[in-house]
Swiss-Prot record:
Lineage: Bacteria, Bacillati, Bacillota, Bacilli, Bacillales
Oligomeric and partner information: A double ring-shaped homohexamer of HslV is capped on each side by a ring-shaped HslU homohexamer. The assembly of the HslU/HslV complex is dependent on binding of ATP.
Cysteine pairings via disulfide bonds: none
Record function comment: ATPase subunit of a proteasome-like degradation complex; this subunit has chaperone activity. The binding of ATP and its subsequent hydrolysis by HslU are essential for unfolding of protein substrates subsequently hydrolyzed by HslV. HslU recognizes the N-terminal part of its protein substrates and unfolds these before they are guided to HslV for hydrolysis.
Pfam families: AAA, AAA_2, ClpB_D2-small
Name of the protein: ATP-dependent protease ATPase subunit HslU
UniProt GO BP: protein unfolding; proteolysis involved in protein catabolic process
Amino acid sequence: MTNLTLMNQLTPKQIVEKLDQYIIGQTGAKKSVAVALRNRYRRQLMDESIRDEIIPKNILMIGPTGVGKTEIARRIAKIVRAPFSKVEATKFTEVGYVGRDVESMVRDLVEVSVRLVKEEKMQLVRVKAEKNAEKRLIKLLAPSQKKKQTTSQNPLEALFGGMNQPDESAEEEVDQELKNKRSQIEWRLQNGELDDEIVTVEVKEQQNPMLDMMRGAGMDQMNGMQDALSGMFPAKKKKRKVTVREAKKILFEDEASKLIDADELAAEGIHRAEQMGMIFIDEIDKIASKEGGGNAQVSREGVQRDILPIVEGSQISTKYGTVNTEYILFIAAGAFHMSKPSDLIPELQGRFPIRIELDKLTQEDFYKILTEPDNALIKQYKALLKTEGIDLIFTKEAVERIAEIAFQVNQDSDNIGARRLHTILEKLLEDLLFEAPEINMESIKVTENYVNEKLAPIMQNKDLTQFIL
C-alpha cells in the first residue's frame, strides 16, 4: 500500500487518534501536523495548473525538551510511510567552515525515500526472488563437480574487485545423481531442516578501499566524487561463512535487487522525497542570533542563510538525481529558553508560518505516559522481565508515586520532560534487572513502599537528585 493510499484513508481526526496511541497530550501540535499531512493529499488531487502554486505550510514547534516534538513528526511519518529525516541545526556550519553541509539534510531524505520505495518493490518481486535465491542456495549446498574456469587478475583488478567474475548463472552439466541430491536438499531446505548448517556465500563489500582513503570526517562535499568513483569500479566481493538461515536473506536481497530497475527506483525515490518528504530540524533555537553575539552571531546567522534557500525551494544534487525541495514539508523545533523565534532572521521566520507552543508535562501527564500508550515504559519493562519468566506488576499507587517524583525532579532541576521517566525507572528497577536471572519467583509486585524505599534517599539529597535522576 502506497503512502498516498494511506493518506486517502486517514482523515485529520483519524491521524490524531493514531498519534494518541503513542503520545500523551499536545493536541494542538497533533492537529497542525495532521492538517498539513491531509493538505498534501488534497494537493495531489488538484489540477496541475494550481497544484504547483500550493506549497506546504512549514511548522515551527516551540517547547521544552521531552514533551513530544520529535516523536509527533517521527510517528506521523511512520503512519503514512512518508520519507522522514531528522537533523540538528547545531551540526551545520556556514559554507566555508568545517562541519556538515546543509544540503546533506536533503541527501539524507532521498536515501530514506529510496530505501522505502525499494522495500515496497522488493515485496512485489518477493516470490520470484525467493525462488531464485533458493536455486542458488541449493547449488551452493550441492555444487557441481565440474571445475569452474579460473580467470587471471592483474593487481588493479584485484584492488577494485575483479572485472572478470565467473558467471554463476552459466549453464552447467548436471548428472542424475546430482539432480537427486539437489531434490532432497530442496525438500529439507523448505522444511527448515538445514537452517543451522554453514554455507559459504559471496557478498559485496560495503566500501571500496580507495573510497575509504578519500573519505574525510564531516566532508559531505566529497559525496559526489565518491558516488562517481563507486560507479566506475565494481563492488569488490568477499566470501563469508554464514548459516543457511542468514544466507537465505543475503541471496534474497541480491536476487530482488536484480529484478528491480535501478533507474525507476531512483526516479520514484526522488519523486516521493519531493512530494511527500518531511525534514525535522531540531534545536533551531541554537542558531538564532542574539544581541551582541559577536563572531558567534555571524556564524549562526550564516547557517540560517544557508538553510533558507533549501526551505524556500532549490535544486539539490544527489547521487540519484536532482531534487526540488519546494514541496518538502519542514518542521523546525526548539526550546527557545535563551532566545525567541523573533531572533531568527526575518526571511526564515516567514518560511515557518504555523507556530505551535507545546505544553509542559504535568504530573497527570506523566501517569498517562507510564500507562496509556501502546509503547508505555511500564509495558516495556514488563516485557523485558517476562523473558526471564517473571511477571512484573505495578500497583496504581506505585505508578502515581513514580509520576509524582518525575514531576518534582523536573521542577527542582532541569526540565527534561518525559525523558525523566527513563532515568527514574532505570534506577528504581536497577537491582531487580540485575538479579532477575537468579530470582526464582513467578511474579514481583512494585508497590508505593518499594518506590519510596529505592528513591527516597536520593530524593532527600538534592545533590544526588541532580546527578542520578
